[in-house]
């Protein structure tokens, strides 16, 4: 079997194609969740915590030079090291929302699966049948 035909057989297997489709859909879905978090959820959370953009929450690890606005991008451009916990919290929230949505999708998928009927119990071996007959005969 040639290298090309081996690769073709591998690439056209159902599992590989399904995985590729899942990765592509997952990447697109990740962008949707990013938009939900950044454009809908975080502005509300930021408003609750004082009207600032939540991703601009940080702690400067050195003194901010005079004249530099107190915004994450400006402070970083000024070369001040920062502990950007707001960005981290945004990413954690993004992950939690994505994980919750995937959980709901998997739960629905499992619900939609048809329950397979339980297989009929296998007939007991002949020895067991004979032993049961002997037992029943002795009980009489």
Curated annotation (Swiss-Prot):
One of its GO terms (cellular component) is plasma membrane. Belongs to the MscL family. Its main location: membrane. Keywords: Cell inner membrane, Cell membrane, Ion channel, Ion transport, Membrane, Transmembrane, Transmembrane helix, Transport. It is found in: Cell inner membrane. This is Large-conductance mechanosensitive channel. InterPro entries: Mechanosensitive_channel_CS, MS_channel, MSC/AndL, MscL_channel. The chain crosses the membrane at residues 16-36, 86-106. Pfam families: MscL (PF01741). It is a multi-pass membrane protein. Homopentamer. The gene is mscL. It comes from the Bacteria. Channel that opens in response to stretch forces in the membrane lipid bilayer. May participate in the regulation of osmotic pressure changes within the cell. GO terms for molecular function: mechanosensitive monoatomic ion channel activity.
């Amino acid at each position: 079997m040639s290298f090309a035909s081996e690769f073709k057989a591998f690439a056209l297997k159902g599992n590989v194609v399904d995985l590729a489709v899942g990765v592509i859909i997952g990447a697109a879905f990740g962008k949707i969740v990013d938009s939900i978090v950044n454009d809908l959820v975080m502005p509300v959370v930021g408003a609750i915590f004082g009207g600032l953009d939540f991703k601009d929450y940080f702690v400067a690890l050195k003194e901010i030079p005079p004249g530099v606005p107190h915004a994450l991008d400006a402070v970083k451009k000024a070369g001040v090291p920062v502990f950007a916990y707001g960005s981290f919290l945004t990413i954690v929230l993004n992950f939690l929302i994505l994980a919750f949505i995937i959980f709901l999708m998997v739960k629905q998928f499992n619900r939609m699966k048809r329950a397979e009927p339980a297989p009929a119990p296998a007939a007991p071996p002949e020895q067991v049948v004979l032993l049961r007959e002997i037992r029943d005969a002795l009980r009489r």
